[in-house]
Amino acid sequence: MSKMRVYEYAKKQNVPSKDVIHKLKEMNIEVNNHMAMLEADVVEKLDHQYRPKAEKKTETKNEKKAEKKTDKPKRPMPAKTADFSDEEIFDDVKEAAKPAKKKGAAKGKETKRTEAQQQEKKAFQAAKKKGKGPAKGKKQAAPAAKQVPQPAKKEKELPKKITFEGSLTVAELAKKLGREPSEIIKKLFMLGVMATINQDLDKDAIELICSDYGVEVEEKVTIDETNFEAIEIADAPEDLVERPPVVTIMGHVDHGKTTLLDAIRHSKVTEQEAGGITQHIGAYQVTVNDKKITFLDTPGHEAFTTMRARGRQVTDIVILVVAADDGVMPQTVEAINHAKAANVPIIVAINKMDKPEANPDRVMQELMEYNLVPEEWGGDTIFCKLSAKTKEGLDHLLEMILLVSEMEELKANPNRRAVGTVIEAKLDKGRGPVATLLVQAGTLKVGDPIVVGTTYGRVRAMVNDSGRRVKEAGPSMPVEITGLHDVPQAGDRFMVFEDEKKARQIGEARAQRQLQEQRSVKTRVSLDDLFEQIKQGEMKELNLIVKADVQGSVEALVAALQKIDVEGVRVKIIHAAVGAITESDISLATASNAIVIGFNVRPDANAKRAAESEKVDIRLHRIIYNVIEEIEAAMKGMLDPEYEEKVIGQAEVRQTFKVSKVGTIAGCYVTDGKITRDSKVRLIRQGIVVYEGEIDSLKRYKDDVREVAQGYECGLTIKNFNDIKEGDVIEAYVMQEVARA
């Protein structure tokens, strides 16, 4: 005997699944539900349990049939007539019961009447059961009419396959199968599921019912096209073709980024720009040895980071331009850290080799400190010595770009709907919203309905980097398009859809979703919730950006932070530099989900605004041990700060007055917030904290005041400090107690 499930056995025995489960529990056989599998020996035991009942039932049925057969000749008996519900018979029985003298005559009349009524009753019951029989009277005609549609329903064929999305109600499933809802409810009951006609069925229940009917089931999975950034379309390997590499040129100011690109393109980009410094993101394509290379000329590295922060990698190769006569500069280090954080291969271009003071070996030596070791010195970083001015070494650089792109095996499918990224966007007076797009897969054509970020439209016109109109753009090709309803942001993703109606729906839905996201609180890593994230397994490494007042402090702080050892989490310093905390640091922290540590330095106004909008955690300290203790305590889950610093105002020192026995009086103008008499202050000079202390006196004209608001002038002295100079910034702050959650 083969195995079978509980519900199959219940169906075989024509009993509910719950009854079988109850029997099994009485036999000390544990089953969880009606889907449990029964072994052959268990099935045999169950058969023994159910067999005696079956025999008894058959015996009782046979006895009843025999009784009926023997009762047939005894039709005149009055006891039998009492079983029928005919009014006339009951009347006759009553009449027969009343007269005691005429009992025999009553019995004779009763016998004749009951014989006729019994025959009529049996004919009526037979017609009711079988849907047949003589159509005598109105009572017999009604059931025959009701049974007419039944044969038609049985003849209806079952579908070979049904599809559903999410779930189905009992009524919907019955309609798809072409069956009555009551039949489906009965089957569910046999499976141990109590359901009503409007009850939703899960996937398992739908599959069980359909398998019982021998119908194939297919579930439709809906894709949220509004979140098309998350949709990755897997292309077949045979559809992929080689695409041009996308190259970003990065480096320090005036090290020759735009001049290098100009030399490669044989155009005069630099002359068109104010002061020879790039003012916007440009995307250009050049041809080398019958192969194309796409260059992005970014203003420093802010746009590069912004695009990465938006969750999409655009650049394939980074060219790090370093002047041979200047060496590694702060922005060079920032560019290295940005490229490494994005896991993009770096090619170092040592520029200005035509200058007599050029020293490429010094540059190579300095870059070794940042793990960029030249190939000739046993490393894996490609170094190209060149001069953008004389065009010496350019061919070697371009060959190296093509070599790295071959190593990276950059491929894309051109035969699909286009997707890509916005490089630049602006509002043109004559043409309306204009966007420079970089196609990353597929082919963009004129007339395509398109969704770009949170806006939408139809591609009205396309212009390539040479200013010529084109009808289509393939992978890695930059084009400027018109036809959008609004100006998108640099770094936004775009996707082409089949029709403009759908593009509009998705564009509006994305705009609505962005509005909701802006209202909700963004979750960024902060020391306050760091331990919770570590505990939940969300954090494997803690990214830090370290800024300090002097190089010695930077090195000491980095060394101390890297020694912190907490099980399961490691500290990763993604950027360390000297100077005030800038907006660029906040951009990098946003892209890398990092915490900014400031040691003896302060964030500037733009950095503060960016940190507030992006919810980046900035920690400011003056004692190195406090930094280490705070980070270590946060990682171990012991961080419990009771007080939080709140900056209430800033004042700029416009003039100083030295008064004997008083000290230096600072004539100040309150630029932000307010300065209060009881607040603590710190003196900031060129972004570096010089002194922290308390206000000794605060006056307006000759009157002592409790506070001075924004836009007013005042005079103040700092307790035990007189080295105040014009141009210094006095920052007032208070310590507020924070209620811990």
Swiss-Prot record:
The similarity annotation says:
Belongs to the TRAFAC class translation factor GTPase superfamily. Classic translation factor GTPase family. IF-2 subfamily.
Stretch list, region G4: 351-354
PANTHER family linked: TR-TYPE G DOMAIN-CONTAINING PROTEIN, TRANSLATION INITIATION FACTOR IF-2-RELATED
A single GO molecular-function term is: GTP binding
UniProt cross-references to InterPro entries, sorted A to Z: EF-G-like_DII, EFTu-like_2, IF2_II, IF2_N, P-loop_NTPase, Small_GTP-bd, T_Tr_GTP-bd_dom, TF_IF2_bacterial-like
CDD domains annotated for this entry? IF2_eIF5B, IF2_mtIF2_II, mtIF2_IVc
Q: Where is this region: G3?
A: 297-300
Using the record's annotation, list all stretches that form the tr-type G domain: 242-411
Q: What is the name listed in the Swiss-Prot or TrEMBL entry for this protein? A: Translation initiation factor IF-2
- Where is the protein localized? Cytoplasm
> Biased-composition ranges for Low complexity?
140-151
Specify where the region named G1 lies, as residue ranges: 251-258
- One family name in Pfam for this protein: IF2_N
Please give the organism.
Answer: Geobacillus stearothermophilus (Bacillus stearothermophilus)
* Positions of the UniProt region annotated as G5: 387-389
